Structure formats: C-alpha cells, structure tokens
C-alpha cells in the first residue's frame, strides 16, 4: 500500500482520524502548523468533545459555534460536587469535618475524577465517569475516595438506580455493576446477547432495570434475576414506534415518542402486569398545550416530572398517577423558572436554572443533608413557614425550593437515595493536599485520591419538596 504524508490527507480523512484522538492529541496537532490548525480547530471536533460532558453547553457560552473554549474551560476548572448522606463514604469524600460539612456541596478534587463527564447518584453511592471512559464508584468503606471499577472496557454512558448502575461500553456491551458485582448482560449466553450494539437507551430503577431496542421494545429484568428479561412492547406494532425519552420508576415506565403527531404526549407502561403484552397508555392530561413544545423527562423511585423545552412548564406525577384522566401536579414555584434540568432522589428534588443556580426542596430524613442547605436543624428557627425541622422524627421538611449556594457555576445536577451531586465550573476550589495513609487492621493502604475541599459559602435557606 502506498504511504501518504499526513499533511497530504484530505480534510474529511483528517476529521475522521480526529475521532480516535484525545484532547491533548488534538491540541498538539492544532499547534503544529496552520494547515493542521485549520482542520483540528473545526467546530465539529470540539462540539463532539463538549457533547460528551453532561450539560456542559448549558453553562459556557458558545460564540460563533466555537466549542473549543467551553471545553478548555471545563478541562481547567470543572469539578464534581457531592452532598448528603455520608455513611460508608457514599459521597466519595476524603474528609468530613465542620469545615467540610456533608450538608453543603463539596468538590471532589482527586485527579481521577477531575475530568468527570457524567455523574449518577444511586441509593448507596455515586458513579462518576471520566473522559477516559473509566468508571469510579463511591460508597467503598475505608477508602479515601471514589474507587475505579476494574475489568470494564471504556464506558461511554451510565445510568444509576437504587442498587446498580448500567454502563454502556464503546463496543456496544451493556454492563450491570455495583461495588460487589460486574455482569456483562450482552456477553455470549447472557440474556441480552442478541442485542449487543442495538441498545438505544437504558435505565436502572428501584428494583428492576430496562433497555430499549428500536423495533423490539423495552427489555425489563429484576434485580437478582439477571437471567430473565421480559419484553414489553408499548404499541401493537413496533415498526413505526420511535422512542424519544423515558424514565424507569418503581414498577413503571413513563415515556414520550418521537412522532410529530404525538409530540407533547406522555405515556405510562406498568411493569407489574400479569402479562407483558399490556400496551402503554397515554396520560392525556399531561399533554403539552403548546404544539411546538415537547417534554424532557426526569424520574426516580415514585416521582416523575415533565419539563417543557423552554424550561417554563413542569408537570409532576407519582406512582399513583395511573389513569388516563389523572391530573398532573402543577406547582406554581416550578413554572416560568427557565429550568434546564430536574433531578429526584427518594424524597428530595433538585433543579438547575438557565442562570446556572441550583435549587432544592423536599425531605431530609435523619438530617442527611441531601438538600445542600446546611444543618437546618441546628439553625435558629426562622419565620419562613416553608422550612420545618422536626426533632422527633429527625427530619427537615422544605416545602418550596431554596437556592443552594456555592462558589461554582453549575451545568448538571443528579440525585438519588439520600444523596445529591452536581457538575460545575469553579475558580475557587482550594488546592489538593496530601492525605496520610489509611490503616485497616494490619494492612496499610496509601491514599490514591487527594482530599476533598469544601467551597465555603454564606449560610443559605432551603427550597421545598412535595411528599
């Protein structure tokens, strides 16, 4: 085969080569000469990098389609934050003292998670995916930070439920992972082996999990029964069915479809039916009143929400929202807010607005701190009727949203169980410090992840939640 000098390759071929290169390679080639700079500064390359980072283009302005700047800002100052219940190191933090309280957002500054592109919160910890496709998990007792999940191929997408996280590998394999288990669901002889490379979307739920395969339907399996997958087909004929978005809650799915005739329609599919041939049914009163507005779905445990494209309309539903004529819950405090994203834990809720602020409301059980508003039970009683601290049940109840303050610009939020997380850009995270080795019995384990640093912020109030 004849060899072709690199500089003589066509523009299209060089763009194709760029898909196999990482950030540093692209930067070095761009700085080599004007010809390569012209190619490797192409907006499609940098848009691809930005698109990998969950929510990044929500926060950093993109000027004249120049995605290079947002990505460079993220590389330099992007951090993952965590707050909430900290037992068994659920937050992945190195230190937890009065200076670094669990009820306020704290940045994870370990080098392995500094380049987090996706964060998911489960019931018993968090999952962080970095730009190299490495998946890290918190909740490891006696560990000093998030721990690498080994024996996985590079991962491109994750979703966490109560006990497990589903992870899609770059070769099309789908994995179900936790601290103690690694199952390749699409491996030969396993239940999803016929669908490797065909899975378009997947969700991990409360006690079951699902994968959507175009033209086939939803494949659903329960925790502990990973050898059995039930097929649920939302329509009698799947040939023309195109899924737009869906959420997997406790015992049911809520979904929207990519059809101009059904834009703005919301459907529910129950998973506890005697037969899996039950069709999805439209929740007619959840239909968007604006024919130009579709829905973005969020959901966890027993709650789901529908967020309009413009971020100004939010409909909420619950496990008991089953009938076709059931009304959505419409909170005035969620309307016309310019919301970019919603996230739900077991009993608490977060939303991110277009001005990059985070708001929270709901219930903190056992004063777990998942609202990120500080130690509400220790603060002086306020005249704000939306904040109630009940020492008899050790819970804080915040009935309307309150802003979470920290010195960072947030571009994505996540919630699950009694924990919360965010991805943000910050200029004021304190430098990393060395952590002394941790001794467990007679084994000495050196620290692998530098200390978390909490970003001090003025004391804040809270926002509320609904039942």
From Swiss-Prot:
<feature type="repeat" description="RCC1 3">
    <location>
        <begin position="355"/>
        <end position="417"/>
    </location>
</feature>
<dbReference type="GO" id="GO:0005634">
    <property type="term" value="C:nucleus"/>
</dbReference>
<dbReference type="InterPro" id="IPR036047">
    <property type="entry name" value="F-box-like_dom_sf"/>
</dbReference>
<dbReference type="Pfam" id="PF12937">
    <property type="entry name" value="F-box-like"/>
</dbReference>
<dbReference type="GO" id="GO:0005829">
    <property type="term" value="C:cytosol"/>
</dbReference>
<feature type="repeat" description="RCC1 1">
    <location>
        <begin position="77"/>
        <end position="131"/>
    </location>
</feature>
<keyword id="KW-0677">Repeat</keyword>
<dbReference type="GO" id="GO:0005737">
    <property type="term" value="C:cytoplasm"/>
</dbReference>
<dbReference type="InterPro" id="IPR001810">
    <property type="entry name" value="F-box_dom"/>
</dbReference>
<keyword id="KW-0833">Ubl conjugation pathway</keyword>
<dbReference type="InterPro" id="IPR009091">
    <property type="entry name" value="RCC1/BLIP-II"/>
</dbReference>
<feature type="repeat" description="RCC1 2">
    <location>
        <begin position="302"/>
        <end position="354"/>
    </location>
</feature>
<feature type="domain" description="F-box">
    <location>
        <begin position="3"/>
        <end position="49"/>
    </location>
</feature>
<comment type="subunit">
    <text>Interacts with skp1.</text>
</comment>
<keyword id="KW-0539">Nucleus</keyword>
<dbReference type="GO" id="GO:0031146">
    <property type="term" value="P:SCF-dependent proteasomal ubiquitin-dependent protein catabolic process"/>
</dbReference>
<dbReference type="InterPro" id="IPR051553">
    <property type="entry name" value="Ran_GTPase-activating"/>
</dbReference>
<dbReference type="GO" id="GO:1990756">
    <property type="term" value="F:ubiquitin-like ligase-substrate adaptor activity"/>
</dbReference>
<dbReference type="GO" id="GO:0000151">
    <property type="term" value="C:ubiquitin ligase complex"/>
</dbReference>
<protein>
    <recommendedName>
        <fullName>F-box protein pof9</fullName>
    </recommendedName>
</protein>
<keyword id="KW-0963">Cytoplasm</keyword>
<dbReference type="InterPro" id="IPR000408">
    <property type="entry name" value="Reg_chr_condens"/>
</dbReference>
């Amino acid at each position: 085969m004849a060899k072709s000098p690199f500089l003589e390759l066509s523009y299209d071929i060089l763009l194709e080569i760029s898909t196999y290169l990482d950030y540093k390679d692209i930067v070095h080639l761009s700085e080599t000469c004007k010809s390569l700079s012209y190619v490797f500064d192409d907006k499609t390359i940098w848009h691809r990098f930005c698109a990998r980072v969950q929510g990044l283009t929500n926060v950093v302005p993109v000027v004249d389609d120049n995605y290079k700047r947002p990505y460079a800002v993220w590389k330099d100052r992007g951090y993952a934050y965590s707050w909430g219940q900290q037992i068994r190191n659920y937050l992945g933090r190195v230190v937890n003292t009065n200076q670094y309280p669990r009820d306020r957002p704290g940045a994870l500054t370990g080098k392995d998670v500094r380049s987090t592109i996706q964060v998911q919160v489960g019931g018993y910890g968090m999952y962080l995916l970095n730009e190299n496709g490495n998946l890290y998990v918190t909740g490891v007792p006696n560990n000093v930070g998030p721990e690498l999940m080994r024996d996985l191929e590079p991962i491109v997408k994750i979703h966490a439920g109560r006990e497990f996280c589903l992870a899609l590998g770059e070769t099309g394999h789908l994995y179900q992972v936790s601290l103690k288990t690694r199952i390749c669901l699409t491996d030969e002889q396993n239940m999803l082996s016929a669908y490797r490379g065909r899975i378009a979307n997947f969700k991990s739920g409360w006690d079951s999990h699902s994968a959507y395969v175009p033209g086939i339907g939803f494949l659903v399996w329960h925790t502990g029964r990973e050898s059995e997958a039930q097929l649920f087909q939302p329509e009698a004929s799947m040939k023309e069915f195109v899924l737009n978005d869906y959420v997997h809650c406790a015992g049911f799915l809520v979904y929207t479809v990519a059809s101009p005739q059904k834009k703005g329609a919301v459907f529910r599919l129950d998973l506890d039916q005697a037969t899996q041939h039950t069709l999805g049914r439209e929740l007619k009163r959840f239909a968007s009143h604006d024919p130009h507005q579709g829905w973005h779905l969020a959901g966890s445990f027993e709650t789901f929400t529908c967020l309009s494209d413009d971020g100004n309309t939010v409909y909420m539903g619950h496990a008991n929202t089953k009938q076709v004529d059931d009304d959505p819950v419409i909170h005035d405090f969620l309307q016309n807010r310019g919301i970019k994203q919603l996230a739900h834990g077991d009993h608490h809720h977060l939303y991110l607005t277009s001005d990059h602020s985070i708001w929270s409301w709901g219930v903190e059980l056992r004063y777990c701190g998942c609202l990120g508003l500080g130690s509400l039970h220790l603060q002086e009683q306020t005249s704000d009727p939306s904040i109630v601290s009940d020492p008899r049940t050790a819970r804080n109840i915040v009935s309307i949203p309150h802003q979470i303050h920290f010195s960072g610009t947030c571009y994505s939020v996540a919630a699950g169980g009694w924990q919360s997380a965010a991805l943000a850009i910050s200029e004021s995270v304190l430098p990393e410090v060395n952590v002394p080795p941790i001794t467990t019995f007679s084994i000495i384990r050196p620290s692998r992840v530098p200390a978390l640093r909490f970003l001090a912020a003025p004391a804040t109030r809270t926002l509320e939640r609904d039942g």
